[in-house]
Structures are given as structure tokens and as C-alpha cells.
Amino acid sequence: MKPENKIPVLTRLSDEMTAVVNFQQPGLPPWPADGDIETQRQYYLLERRFWNADAPSMTTRTCAVPTPYGDVTTRLYSPQPTSQATLYYLHGGGFILGNLDTHDRIMRLLARYTGCTVIGIDYSLSPQARYPQAIEETVAVCSYFSQHADEYSLNVEKIGFAGDSAGAMLALASALWLRDKHIRCGNVIAILLWYGLYGLQDSVSRRLFGGAWDGLTREDLDMYEKAYLRNDEDRESPWYCLFNNDLTRDVPPCFIASAEFDPLIDDSRLLHQTLQAHQQPCEYKMYPGTLHAFLHYSRMMTIADDALQDGARFFMARMKTPR
């Protein structure tokens, strides 16, 4: 797609989204485009500090969980002494960036809005860790807390997964992995998915959207995929291209959120249409005027807070529904 033929999304954003795009953090250096991956990870952490400020206070606990790949750091957010369910959160960042600190505010808000314990999983990043390591680490974390629930005052009879962007793929892939491998970690009552990618290699939205403003050009997406996968054959794996998995049965209820001007929006649309066609419980909501990753910006965007509350309401409704 010739860049000039793409939709000029920056002229169509909401006022809130435009304010975020134009916001300049004092003293923040430019993105180190030519830096190595560790330099970019440190920059991402620095840039996200502002957006994670002023988050709700609550009891937190850090725990190193043993997995087949070594210990994985987790952080438990407990808004109240007892919880009706446990929600596992997988952060975004193209599989190569991000950690528990870059998504701290999102997890705190989600814990407050659901009233449930949220467990953030600091899965190993690519390219150092390749598919399916992050999924297997997530499953190992779920198994660990299922076996040690009393020690951490957890309710693991009802669990859920949540994630944004690449984390949304990992959230859904992990739930399907549990189903497909017959691993019991609790009853998965819901999956909360914000602007994920689910396996499309091309789409109308990938042609029309994406640029320097969101880090999701065709070249960017190819780079993330190349860093994450072991080889070309992995592209068709049912836990990477989730449309190659069986989405006709036993898929936990999914809240599928998308951003209007996200090149990945067609992934969310296709996922919703597929689940809906096969009577799998799901809800789809598109947030107008937004770009990919808008969930981070709840300090300046009420719609980001709305999107979190919408997901929380979906999860809470499933806590009350026998499944």
C-alpha cells in the first residue's frame, strides 16, 4: 500500500486522542529508533512512567513463580481482602517491550473496577524468548496459583484472562491452550481483550491504517512477528494464528475491544464475527476516535477509563453466571 493512499487518521482522531498524540513529556528524549532492544525497553519504561502515575492504591505482592523456563515474576493486586475471582493480566508491547511497571495503572484500575485480585505476569520477552514460551509460562503461573491459592488468599474456582495488544493474543492463546491440553487451573469465566492481534497476515485495516504515530506499519508488524516466532511454520500454529484453532466450541466468554483507527481492528472484528457465528458468548465494542494502545492514557482520556470499566463489567457479570 502506497503510504499516500492510507487514511489520514491524525485528522480524524477524537479531541482526547489528539491531545495525547500532541502531548510532550518534559525532558523526555526522542524514541531511540536506532538503539538496541534493551535501550528501547528502557525508553518505553521511562515514557510510561507519566501515564502510570496517580493510580489507585491497594495491597500488592510480588511473587517469583517457578516455570519450566525459570522463575517468572508476578504481581498480585488485591483491592480487598477477599476476592470472588482471579484475573490474570498479560501486558502488550509487541512481544518485545513492556513489563509489570509499564502496565501498572491498567492493572490497578482493572482490580479496582472488578473488585477482584489481578495477577500481572511478567512473561519472558522476545526475541530472547520465542513462541510458545510466553504461553507456557502463563500456563505454569496459572497452575502454580491454582495449587497455592490458600497461601495467597486467592479464589481460583473462577479465573479469567485479560490483555492488551500482543497481551490480548497471549490471553486468548493461553485460555485455548488450557482447553486444548486439558489443563485445569479453574473455571475460565471470561477473557478481556483490548485491541489484540489474533493471526491475520493481511487485512483492509492493515492496509489503510498504521504509521509512525502508532508504531504499527507493515514493517513494524513484520518485525514483531519475526522476533516472536521460531520459524515461518509457527505462523499457522493454532496458538498464534488463533483463527486456525477451534473457535466453534468451549471458548470462554470474550469481551473484544477495538480502536477505530487501529490497523489491527480487523483481527478483532473477525474474532467477534467468528465467535458470534458459532454461538460462542462474546461482546464487541469499538471505541471511536482512538488509536491502538489508547488504554494506557486514562490520565487524559475518559474513553480509556470507559474501556476498562466496560471490560470489568463484562467480567463481573460472568462471575454471577454459572458456566
From Swiss-Prot:
A GO cellular component annotated for this chain's UniProt record is: cytoplasm
Q: Where is the signal peptide?
A: none
Where is this protein primarily located? cytoplasm
Q: Which UniProt keywords apply?
A: Cytoplasm, Hydrolase, Serine esterase
- Residues forming coiled coils: none
For whether the record's keyword set contains Hydrolase, the answer is yes
Q: Which Gene3D superfamilies match?
A: alpha/beta hydrolase
Give, as one word, the top-level EC class: hydrolase
**Presence of the UniProt keyword Protein biosynthesis in the record:** no
| PROSITE patterns, alphabetized | LIPASE_GDXG_SER
UniProt-annotated catalytic positions? 165, 262, 292
Map motif Involved in the stabilization of the negatively charged intermediate by the formation of the oxyanion hole onto the chain: 91-93
| Single Gene Ontology MF annotation | short-chain carboxylesterase activity
Localization, per the record, is: Cytoplasm
EC numbers:
3.1.1.-
Top-rank taxon, per record: Bacteria
HAMAP family, A to Z: Acetyl_esterase
User: In UniProt terms, what function does this protein have?
Assistant: Displays esterase activity towards short chain fatty esters (acyl chain length of up to 8 carbons). Able to hydrolyze triacetylglycerol (triacetin) and tributyrylglycerol (tributyrin), but not trioleylglycerol (triolein) or cholesterol oleate. Negatively regulates MalT activity by antagonizing maltotriose binding. Inhibits MelA galactosidase activity.
Question: Which family, according to the similarity comment?
Answer: Belongs to the 'GDXG' lipolytic enzyme family.
User: How is this protein organized at the quaternary level?
Assistant: Homodimer. Interacts with MalT and MelA.
Query: What is the designated name of this protein?
Result: Acetyl esterase
Which species is listed as the source?
A: Salmonella typhimurium (strain LT2 / SGSC1412 / ATCC 700720)
